[in-house]
Amino acid sequence: MHSRPLRLAMQLGLFQLSLGILGVLILGLLNRLLIQDIQVPAVLAAVAVGGQQLMGFARAWFGHRSDRIPISRLRRTPFIVSSTVAIALLFCVACQLVLRLTTSKEASGGELNGLLMGLLILVFVGIGTAIAAGGTAFSALIADRTTEAERPRVLSVVWGMRLLGVLLGSVLVNQVFGSACAADASRSSVLAGLERLSLVTPLLLLGLGLVSVFGVERRTTGLMLPAGLVPPDVPQRLALPQLLLQLRTIPQAGRFLGVL
């Protein structure tokens, strides 16, 4: 891989790195804390954690909104930056709600606070919405920024960094929690570790997300379009329902939706 695509892949990969870390913290840590330590019914925990996946269907809408922005303006970066900020803030809120659930359940003699649980579900739905918005714009940015020959190599590095984020997320939990990761750790030490994590992780996610797109799209505008060439802007002239109907003419899209 040449130096320019490699540098681009490493920079953009930081966004996927942050999502890998987030996935470990939500699916591996918060999910376990809700079921094992707080003893929330597994069904409710699954609804809360899985709520973010329900918003994957919003990707088409966010992608359409991004494509409708004039080519002379930043089309992808605002979505990615907004997504990064929202994910960082909402993860901090999710950690605080988990802590509140614990103290509330202890104070009420084991009764689950329905309001806090409902808020936690909404927060996870918000995280899923932010991931859908940022992830769609991120994929479009890669397509805008690379040629057809470069794209497979850039994507391999970018998604490889997603896997690296999973490993780093595990390391982050071990470093922040310390002895609270032990099987016989007390609940108070686990909650103290979660409190520390709610302060450290949002800053890390925010930093990775912002650095990943810093200057990328501004450079793209000048590099990818020859002087005097105005690209066809078909998505600006078609409504979202019309674009979705066009998917029916693509055999691969039909098979993919059938699998879903």
Which stretches of residues belong to each language-model region?
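Helix-loop boundary and gating motifs at the non-cytosolic
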Residues: M1-G56, R255-L260
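Intracellular loop-helix junctions on the cytosolic face of multi-pass helical membrane proteins
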Residues: M1-P5, G110-I121, T129, A133-G134, ...
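Small-residue-rich transmembrane alpha-helices and their cytosolic helix-loop interfaces
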Residues: Q16, V49, Q53, F124, ...
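Hydrophobic core of transmembrane alpha-helices in multi-pass small-molecule transporters
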Residues: L17, A88-G134
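Transmembrane alpha-helix boundary/hinge residues in polytopic small-molecule transporters
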Residues: L25, L29, W61, A133-L141
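Short helix-loop-helix connector
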Residues: I38, P70, A143-T147
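Juxtamembrane helix-start elements in MFS-like secondary transporters
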Residues: P41-V49, R76, L116, L120, ...
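Central cavity-lining transmembrane alpha-helices of secondary-active solute carriers
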Residues: A45-I69, S82-L90, L164-S170
